[in-house]
Structure formats: C-alpha cells, structure tokens
Amino acid sequence: MTLHAYLGRAGTGKSTKMLTEIKQKMKADPLGDPIILIAPTQSTFQLEQAFVNDPELNGSLRTEVLHFERLSHRIFQEVGSYSEQKLSKAATEMMIYNIVQEQQKYLKLYQSQAKYYGFSEKLTEQIQDFKKYAVTPEHLESFIADKNMQTRTKNKLEDIALIYREFEQRIQNEFITGEDALQYFIDCMPKSEWLKRADIYIDGFHNFSTIEYLIIKGLIKYAKSVTIILTTDGNHDQFSLFRKPSEVLRHIEEISNELNISIERQYFNQLYRFNNQDLKHLEQEFDALQINRVACQGHINILESATMREEINEIARRIIVDIRDKQLRYQDIAILYRDESYAYLFDSILPLYNIPYNIDTKRSMTHHPVMEMIRSLIEVIQSNWQINPMLRLLKTDVLTTSYLKSAYLVDLLENFVLERGIYGKRWLDDELFNVEHFSKMGRKAHKLTEDERNTFEQVVKLKKDVIDKILHFEKQMSQAATVKDFATAFYESMEYFELPNQLMTERDELDLNGNHEKAEEIDQIWNGLIQILDDLVLVFGDEPMSMERFLEVFDIGLEQLEFVMIPQTLDQVSIGTMDLAKVDNKQHVYLVGMNDGTMPQPVTASSLITDEEKKYFEQQANVELSPTSDILQMDEAFVCYVAMTRAKGNVTFSYSLMGSSGDDKEISPFLNQIQSLFNQLEITNIPQYHEVNPLSLMQHAKQTKITLFEALRAWLDDEIVADSWLDAYQVIRDSDHLSQGLDYLMSALTFDNETVKLGETLSKDLYGKEINASVSRFEGYQQCPFKHYASHGLKLNERTKYELQNFDLGDIFHSVLKYISERINGDFKQLDLKKIRQLTNEALEEILPKVQFNLLNSSAYYRYLSRRIGAIVETTLSALKYQGTYSKFMPKHFETSFRRKPRTNDELIAQTLTTTQGIPINIRGQIDRIDTYTKNDTSFVNIIDYKSSEGSATLDLTKVYYGMQMQMMTYMDIVLQNKQRLGLTDIVKPGGLLYFHVHEPRIKFKSWADIDEDKLEQDLIKKFKLSGLVNADQTVIDALDIRLEPKFTSDIVPVGLNKDGSLSKRGSQVADEATIYKFIQHNKENFIETASNIMDGHTEVAPLKYKQKLPCAFCSYQSVCHVDGMIDSKRYRTVDETINPIEAIQNININDEFGGEQ
C-alpha cells in the first residue's frame, strides 16, 4: 500500500498528470488491475466523458469513475451487502417527522415547534450531520450527563438525543441510512480482494466529513495505492487562502502517521492551464501580500449592470459573440453564480437567445402541476373542502384535461363559488350548482343565452367529475386503517383518476415534439410518487395511523422529491454554483452576481445547534462536527479563487447595482482586489458601453428587434439615437426573414394610452336610443368619462366575492329602516327602548337572510357583525325618535321609487329630459324618506337620504354646481313634480335637503371620571345631526326644530340663531327658496350636458380632481385605463373650487317653471 499526494495551486497540471497516468496504465494493460477515480457526484459525468471521448482509449473496462456511495455499492457486489433495507432521504424525513409527533409531549425545548414541517427537516439534517461525523446518541447522552451547561443548551441536546435514540431504535436490524451504509462499507473493506488490487485516485474534493476520512483511511490501508489530488500550496496557516484543502492534507498526514505509511508528495508549480499572462497573473497574485501590478491584455473583464436582468442579457450577448466571432463551442463556456435569484433569470433569458445550457442543480418537484394537484387534494381533505385548496386543485388542470377550454370553465366556476361562498360539503349540493343560478352571477340576473347555458352546463359537469374523484379518494382513504392500506388506497385512487395513462400519454407527446426534458420530468414525477408510497409501506408497513397523520407524513415525503436532469446535449453552456459546480479548463468562464453579500457571502448558522454550542461540544466531547460559520467565512476567498481559475482563456466578472427585490447592491471586495492587480483593468458600465457601441446590442435577431423598438421610441421622443439603429431598422424591414413581428412592434411605437371618441352609431349601439339611468351613473361620468364607458359601455364588472361590501351595508340599513318605518307609519316619537329592540330584531330576521345568499349567517364573524348592525340600528332609531320629538315635519313616504312610467301608484313620475342630439333621458331612482309639514295650504317637503359613509353624508354645493353631486336636487325636483301622487296641497315648496348618517358614533373622554351616562346618551344621539341645505323661509326654520330661539343652535338640523333671532352663518346651512329652485334647474341642465357628452361618444381617461383627491383611489377600472398618478397629471380635470356656489347660482339667468305636476 502506497500513498501519493499531488499538491499544487489551480491550473498546475495535477489532474492532467493523474489522467495521463491512468491513461498510460490503461493502454499498457487494458484488462489489468482496477483503477478507481473517486470524485464528487457532480463531477463523475464529466470525467466519464473525458475517458469515453479520448480517441486513444474509446472507453475502458478497467477504469471506473465513482463517488463514495457508488464505490461502496461496487464493494458490496463483491463481498455481499447489508441485509437491512436502505432508507431514502424522503423515508428518513418521514420517519423522523412521525417520531417527533409521537414524542412531542416529552420534548423540553422544542415542544411548540414540533408541529411544524420545517422542524423535522432541520432535525433530520442535524442527525445526518451527527452521523457524518460519527456522533452517536450515546455520545450526546454521556456528554449531557457529565457536563454542566446552560439550561437551554441542555434541553436542546436532550430533545435531539431523544429523537436520535428513538430513530436508531426504530431502524435497528431493519433499516439502514446512507451514512450507516458507508460505515458498513468501511467494515467490508478488508474482505474485498478487488479493492486490494486497485489503484485509487481521489480528485475534486476540498474537504471531507469524518465518515469520509474513515473511508479514505480504509482505502489507504487496503488498496494497492491511493493518490489524492489537492489544490493547495501546502501552507498549513489557518489564515491561508488554501486553509480548507490544507486542513484535508493535515488529516491525511494524521492517517498516514497512524498507519505508519509515508506520504509521497509531489508538488506542481508550473502553470499549464492558462493560455495568457492575464489569467496566470490573476492566479499567482490573488492571495499575494505585496501586489505586483501588470498591464491587462484583455482576457479579464469586469461588467457593471443596472439590474440582474440586464446583467444576464449582456452575458447572453457575449456568449453569442464567443460562438460567432471567436469560434468557441457552447461546451467551451461556463457560467458560475451564487445568488439563487439568477437561476430563474437563466431559464427566462437564455432561451430567448437560443443558447443551449444545462444548470447543474436539483429542482424541487413541488410546483409541478401533478404535485400541486396531489398536495391540493390532500389539503382539500385536511381542510374539510375549503375553497382555496379546491380552487388550486382545479387550476392544476390535471383532473380536467378531457374538457375543451378547461381553464376557462374553471375560471367561470371560480367566479361562481367565490360569489356564493361555496365551502365544505356545500360543494356536494347539486341545487347550489343549478345552471339557472349562473344567470345571477354578478349583481344583475339575466336570461341565459343558448351558448351561455351550454357553457355553464359544461362547468357543472366539470365540477361533478372532479367532485366524484375527490369523493372516491376520500372514501378509499377513510376505509384505510394502516399505512399500507392508505398507500394502497392512494395508488388505486390515482388509477381511478386515470393519472398513469394520462401522464404516459403526455410524456409520449412531449417526446414526439422533441421536448425531451419535459418528458423526463413526467417520468420522474410518477416514479417519485411511487417511490414515496413504497417508502411509506417500507417504513411503516401495517402500523396503524390516522388519515390526518398519514397525509401529513405523505406530504413531508413529497417535499423531498427533486428533479435530477441529465444534459440533453453535449454542446451546451454549463451553469452551476460557485460552491459546487465542477467545470474545468473552459475557454471562457462568466462569474455573475459578484456583489458584496454574495461573494463573499455572510455565513450564518442555520442548524439547530449554534456555532458556540458546536465549539463547546467539540472541545468537551473531543469530537469533530461540521465547520462553524466563522470557519466557512474564512474559506470565501478560496471559493472565489477556485471559481475564477476554472477558465483557460477568458474570465468575465459581472455584477449588478440592484437586487431582485429592488435593493441597492455593492461590488464584491474581491473585484476591487482583482482590479488592483492590473493597470488597465477598468469596470465596463454596460449601459454606457452600449451607448458608445450600439452595434454591440445587435447580436441576436429577435432581441435586436426589441432593443430597436426602445431606440426608435427614444428617437420619436426627440432623443439622440445612433444612426446605426436607423440602419438596422432598414435592414430588418427589408428582410423577409428578419422582419417577422416588426409591424407589431412598430404599431406599439405610436401607441398612446388615449381612448377614441365613439361615433354616433356606436354610441347608440352601446347605450341605446334612449338613456335610462340612475343619478349615480351621471355622477360617475362626471368623476371620469372612461369610468362610465367601462361600466356602462363595455359593461365590465368586478368579480363578486362572498363578503360584505360597503354598499351591502348601506342596502341593509335602508331596508331595515324602511321595514321599521312602515310598521310604525313614520312616527318615531312613539318608540321606547323595548319597542326599538323588538322592531330591530324583527327587521333583521326578515332582511339579513336575503343578503348575499345568507352571508351574515355563514360564520361567527358575520354573526357578530349582524349583532353590530343591530346595535347601530337601535342607536339610529333612538336618534330618529329624538329628532322627531322636536320637529313638526313628519315622515310620510319611505323608499319611494320614481321612473318615467311608474309601475305602481306608489311610484313617482320622473320628467323626461332630452339631450342636444334629441335622445330622451329617463331618470330613475329611489328616495329614502320624504317628510312633510303643512301650514296654511302650503306643504313643505324634506328629502332625507340615509348614508352609511361619513364622506358621502355631506351636501357640497360646489359639487352640486358642477354636476358632481346631483342626487338631492334631483330628488327634490321629483317630489315637487309629484304633489298629487304624494297627496300634498296645491302649493308645495322645498323644506330641506338633508343627509342622515347611519353609523356607530364614538365620543372621546380624557378619563373615566368624565363619563356621565345620561349625558353620554344625549351626546351620542347628537352625533346623528342632519346635514345638508335648508330653505331659509321662517316657516321652515320654525318647523325643523321647535326649540329654536335666539342664541340657540339646533342639534338635529343645520340651523342656528343669533341673539337677535337672525340665522347664524356658522351654525346654519340655508338658502332662499329661489336659490334652491335655481340649483334644481341647473341640476337638470347638468343632466342634459352630461347625457349629451355620453351620446357624443366621450370616453376620455380624465378623472376630476377635487380637493386634492382623485376618484381613482376607489375606482375598479385602473387596471384597464392604466392611469398613473405620478405621470398622468395632465389628464386630470379640475374645477374652480374657490367659487361661492350660492352666489354663482344666483348670478345665472334661469328661465324655468321649475317643473310641473306630472
């Protein structure tokens, strides 16, 4: 047995010497003693290719490239393997999770964390870490017993030891872990005659675990020879660049001393890898204490980009240049990264440039539709059919592929179930999914067309099919008692879903279309699913388990599944992480994401045991554990060194100034260090570079068109653009091959976010030959013409959800107050507390079940909200009683509707107006309350409007003047026109236009001592004071509040008197009768103007800004109009807010008879 060590810095020919040595032995004796090359898992494929592709060898029966685990299997084939079943990573995790749940009550520190999936994962990692470093439960238990330590640390180690011990007992004589298998491999080494004849080479490693050192020790002891290759200069200084591999060398020296074998060291000092002085100087001087600066010859570049996306786009362009102009092949190029955010960018950007690549990393299967379907199916059962997992299940499209346009059907179903609040076993109620119910989707019911009916029938059929499958799954699972039963039931359910056939069909189609990677994913998904089921049966077998626990454990297993993709072609760019990727002797290596915080990367302890606890354990127990954070931090420079010395021709470093979440980023200090080694190594700012060299952006036809679009956009905005872009446009335009898609891009150049004025015919087609509308529709137009166009022209509707909206609350209050008012004939004065509560309960029992499909009885929260609504109504009735006590006006009519042609005698007639185009305007609506007071054959009327929002319970006369608030004047106009239908006298005059705010008032107190219950009740009632505008006629003033006297301000209406008996300006909101009539007539003119603009086809995105507020804040159509408050201020309309509206209206010359009796 001999031991060799090839030592040297990167690129000095160590691996080449090894490969040459192996090659010579193979040529000399192709069937001689075995030669074993041990390498990291991610390097084995590359090394195998090197032997296969060597024209002098064309493969070999003598040499094998193996990692430690595969080597153990090779020995087991010879001497016999263990009898126990080997646990996969997923099986180990599932077993530990189940143990944690069973032992939860015995845990001291982690009892509350035990229920979380992530805890068992951390615990599994910790146990595997202990196994790698040969730490047993006995080690932990004896250490805890012998040492005094902090209570938290002791409790932590006791918890871990408890689970570790239980795990070891469960697997004893029945199962074996990967780490235990390696220990068994060590025990088998002396029996292997094959190993005794073998020459062993170990290359590509920079550190080993304790169990791996024990394997190396066995190889040295029993193999014919062992040669280990290490990237180190032999310096054992713990602060040396080569600390990590030198630590390996120190361990090997200890092993050799223990075995009494000398190490034959061979030092490699001559640099062979690098083709130029730049890379040689970079390697030699990176860790130099005294810098020797030389001129850079252009083989090293540092790129600075604004964003990560721009960074990868630039790398892609430079790869195209490498291939096209420098005659490289894709396989000559590698990209190394460290920030995981780049993996997504590679997948999204490199295909746009048609660059073949392979990312050497495992991807989780979690987000694949099949896995999402299975996990959603599990959650549906666990959550008792809650809506979110159900919708996720449906949207995977795995169970609905047989339906044409299944995604559209699922969208319709989602709209319906969100509106109806379908959850739990309501999914099974066929009556809820009657096709006729779909006609009520949204706010207005309509008769279904034949196409709509057919579509909704398909929706119902799709729902039934999926429900049948879920019910079958639930039934099968509910009948199971043991883990084996559950696994069998699950597999049979998948067969009932026809999932195997479906997946195999999909795989074959993908293969036929050349999408082999996606086809491979399908295979791995199915095989992974079967493996988890097999693991469950293997680990738990006939062990009884609840369905809930089984589904939890099963989900844990699914979490562990990962795609392991082999390269789809040989000629492709290799992409990997700087820490793990094994790329050697590439012509060009790109190191992306070279930012501070990534390289070097702050290393923080993520295991259950902290760094301090590790150090204490190592010192006191005399064992070695995985490196602590501070040790790993010291090795960051070595990681950078290894990554940048993989190239033999060129190295390009790149970094961005902004992270994936928009955060600022700094350049890596290693780049500053590298830059200091050269005289002419400047950082290239990518945007500035392209500005000077626009042709550098024109590397790929498709991407050049996109960049051309940006350049032409700048040119149209009168910015200076290089002539080469105009030349590029002409070349692309004149080429049949290149011009594809150019017309679409050019049309986008002239796109402006402006609407088009509708023609007369189209306006009539959209809005009809007469306008039948509520007041709020006209107010909406005044807020923004586009809002009106979107809602009433395009008829866009928001998705209705099963939740209480603000307008629902308003409707409830209106309905309840109408119900009670009619029961008492508007005589609120007669109410006492008992009567108020009785009537409130009656009204709520009658009305609440009709709201949103009985929404207010659907949950504890909504039932609580119902009680809150009841309390508000009771307080409101108390306020109405108080107001009625001191007012001569009597409520007479409630929720009175009006329209052009009344349907009943109780409805009022609305006068028809006409637009400038001759289009009739028919206004409809409903007046909450009409109060009347008659004196001397003259009737005065008050309009009372209930508002549940404080912001809308104010009459702003400026808004009235400009047509932004049209409701109250319209209502008063309608009442004045309908004196006969209302049973009023010949002379009818306006009294007040008043808002009543239905709310839950609050009063602030400085201390409890300030509270007087009687006064508190009075103060709360006063919070309901009416607001609006009152006729200044003395008769009206006297009737509104009988308590009015000099120096008194009413607490029920907006009227107050000075000490001389005149109306106070501060406490009164009044106008004379003529002014009110002028407001009414001006309001009509606003109707006509607004309706005329609508029929003229105005659809501008032009919100009206008033008092620094925009209607956009509460608009549902911003995603359609794309108005931006930061850049679209020129679109805003404004009005003169400084006017005195009463003076302004008085100055208008209006000739009108103020309507007439209809």
UniProtKB/Swiss-Prot annotation:
Subunit structure: Heterodimer of AddA and AddB.
Biological process annotations from GO: double-strand break repair via homologous recombination
Cofactor comment: Binds 1 [4Fe-4S] cluster.
One MF term in the entry's GO annotations: metal ion binding
Other noteworthy facts: Despite having conserved helicase domains, this subunit does not have helicase activity.
Cross-referenced InterPro entries: ADDB_N, DNA_helicase_suAddB, DNA_helicase_UvrD-like_C, P-loop_NTPase, PDDEXK-like_dom_sf, PDDEXK_AddAB-type
HAMAP family assigned to the protein according to its UniProt record, in alphabetical order: AddB_type1
Residues reported to bind [4Fe-4S] cluster: 784, 1112, 1115, 1121
Function recorded in the entry: The heterodimer acts as both an ATP-dependent DNA helicase and an ATP-dependent, dual-direction single-stranded exonuclease. Recognizes the chi site generating a DNA molecule suitable for the initiation of homologous recombination. The AddB subunit has 5' -> 3' nuclease activity but not helicase activity.
EC number: 3.1.-.-
NCBIfam families assigned: addB_Gpos
Keyword DNA damage: yes
Pfam families xrefs: ADDB_N, PDDEXK_1
Residues in UvrD-like helicase ATP-binding domain copies: 1-275
UniProt entry tagged with the keyword Transmembrane: no
Name of this protein: ATP-dependent helicase/deoxyribonuclease subunit B
SUPFAM superfamilies (UniProt xref): P-loop containing nucleoside triphosphate hydrolases
Keywords (A to Z) from UniProt: 4Fe-4S, ATP-binding, DNA damage, DNA repair, DNA-binding, Exonuclease, Helicase, Hydrolase, Iron, Iron-sulfur, Metal-binding, Nuclease, Nucleotide-binding
Gene3D superfamilies: 3.90.320.10, P-loop containing nucleotide triphosphate hydrolases (3.40.50.300)
Family: Belongs to the helicase family. AddB/RexB type 1 subfamily.
The organism's taxonomic lineage, starting at the top: Bacteria, Bacillati, Bacillota, Bacilli, Bacillales
EC main group: hydrolase
Record-annotated UvrD-like helicase C-terminal domain positions: 269-583
Cofactor(s) demanded: Mg(2+); [4Fe-4S] cluster
